[in-house]
Every structure is written in C-alpha cells, then in structure tokens.
Amino acid sequence: MAENKYMTFKPSSLVFAILILPLLAQSAELSVTSRQEIDLLLDRLGSSSCEFYRNGTWHSAAKAHNHLNRKLAYLLDKHQVGSAEEFIEIGASKSSVSGKPYLVRCNKQPEIPSAFWLRRELDLIRVNAAAQTARKN
C-alpha cells in the first residue's frame, strides 16, 4: 500500500491543534451592527409592557432589560457572543443557573419562550433597518 504524504500524522500537528483550539473558541467578536441590534432588542424588551419569567418569578420588562444587560456584559467579557443570534441562544433564552427557559408574557397573551419573542423582535429590527437603508438609496 502506498504511503500518502498528506495523511501522515505528525505529533507537531496535534500540539498545534491543542494550543490553537482554545484561542479559536474564545475568538467571538461582536460587530458594531450586532451590538446595535442587541441594544435595540433589549431596549424594545425594556420599554415593552411585557413581563419576563426567570427562575420561578415574573419580572418587569425593566428588570428583564437590566438582567439581560448584565448577562451580555459577562458574555462579552468572556468573548462568548459574536452575533445577536448567539446572544439570544447563549444568554437570553434560559437561566445559566437553573437551565430553565425564560418566558415572555405580553398584554395578557399566553407566555412564549423568550428566544421566540427575541428572534421575532430581531427580525423586525432588521426589516426596519433594511427599509431605512432602502429609503436612503
């Protein structure tokens, strides 16, 4: 059987992979646009008439805004968020303490998972941004 020079295992390759993987895992950088989207998202939540359920208790929209801002700051410090979607997935959809999902309830409507509410609002933010860009052009 012929030896394939491209498939040969080199111990130095393993060492390189071990050293570089942690750096790649922590390389999430938030773009200016993503940060603006998250800020708008949290502002929409904070100024809404919705309630936010976490760890067994309903909280006001203002308290939800403050809580999620603290989680965002922590995640940014740890380089764990690179987009609005990642923030929703990692920081705004469930408790990092209990693992229980966050819920949102607006205007006496049935509660829904916060991830659904936030993604829907993010879609609206993006539609509005695209419409503003189109009007400028």
Residue ranges of model-derived segments:
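Compact alpha-helical subdomains of small soluble proteins
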Residues: G56-N137
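N-terminal signal peptide c-region/cleavage motif recognized by signal peptidases
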Residues: I20-A25
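N-terminal secretory signal peptides
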Residues: A28-K71
